[in-house]
Amino acid sequence: MKKVFITGGAGYVGAVMVPHLLEQGFEVTVLDLMIYGEHILQNHANLNAVKGDIRDQDLLKKLIPGHDVVIHLACISNDPSFEMNPDLGKSINLDAFRPLVEISKKSNIKRFFYASSSSVYGIKQEPNVHEEMELEPLTDYSIFKADCEKILAEYQSDDF
C-alpha cells in the first residue's frame, strides 16, 4: 500500500482529494493547521490527521519518513487572503518550501507533487495557457508560487 503525506490536506483541495485517495486504498497522513476545523476529514482506518504547521521542521522530520509520496497543498491561498498578512503568507508559501523539499528528499520520498497556481503565468492574451509559457507572476502570492516551482526544479530527479 502506498503511503501519501499531504500538507494542507484539510483545506479546500485536500478535503476533496483525501477521501478519494482513501477510497483508492492509499494510507494517508495529513498535516494541516485545521483552521476550518478538525471535522473536515472523516475518521478512516488509513488516515492519520495531524494538527500542525509546515514551518515546524522537527515535525516534518518526524512525520515524512516512511511515506512514498508528498503532495504539498498547504498555503495561504489566493491574493486577498495572502494580502491580509503578507509576512505570514511569505513564511508559509515560500520560506517553508525549501525545508519541506529537502526533508522530503532526505526521507527518500519517491514523488513530490506541488500544487502551484495558474496565476504564475500572469495575464495572457492567448486563449490556452500551458506549462511551457513564460512565468509572469504579478502579485506576491503568484511570485512566491513561481519561486517554489524554481526551487523544486533544483531538486528534480527521476526518483523524486
Annotated model-derived regions:
Residues V16-H20, I103, I151:
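Rossmann-fold NAD(P)-dependent oxidoreductase module
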Residues I40-Q42, P80-D87, I123-P127:
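Conserved catalytic-core motifs of eukaryotic protein kinase domains, centered on the activation segment
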Residues F144-D147:
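Active-site helix of classical SDR
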Residues H72, R98-T139, E154:
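Conserved Rossmann-fold NAD(P)-dependent oxidoreductase catalytic core, especially the SDR/UDP-sugar
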Residues M1-V69:
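N-terminal Rossmann/SDR dinucleotide-binding element
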Residues I54-I92:
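NAD(P)H-binding glycine-rich loop region in Rossmannoid oxidoreductase-like domains
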Residues D140, I151-F160:
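Active-site-adjacent segment of SDR/Rossmann-fold oxidoreductases
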